Amino acid sequence: MNFYNNFFFIALPYVAIIIFVLGTIYRYRETKFKYSSISSQFFETRMLYWGSVPFHYGIIFLFFGHLTAFLIPRYVLLWNQQPLRLAILEITAFVAAILTFLGLINLFYRRLKNPYVRKVTNYADIILEILLLTEIFLGLWVAYSYRWGSTWFAV
């Protein structure tokens, strides 16, 4: 493995987890979880439903899949020894990622096109959604370009 593979696929995930944990502790101790985002769910619900539901179902499935591979990689590798189970896992995870991506696109479109929602939108919301779209797109790209990621992810 070269430096970039070691950095992006070994070191960086651990750095992200450490920052997440320390940031959560800091935020709890210093600000008591004060949220400043304004809710937009009352302005329009139809597009919210078709964006929020697929996004959350997909992201929850992906989160627990990554958590499983992170916590018990040996059992993921044992599961993936049978080609049919490996294919089912890969296809299901890819569909969940597409569901997440399409749901977030719908939410982003709603944020930009609905005048009521746009009124309560600030630049941080837009930047965050662009970053999430980029992250999910890159995950889809890696999953499509480098097959059987659930096996090498757990190694």
Regions found by a protein language model. Give the residues of each.
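N-terminal juxtamembrane/topogenic regions of multi-pass membrane proteins
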Residues: 8-12, 23-26, 47-50
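Alpha-helical transmembrane segments
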Residues: 22-27, 104-107
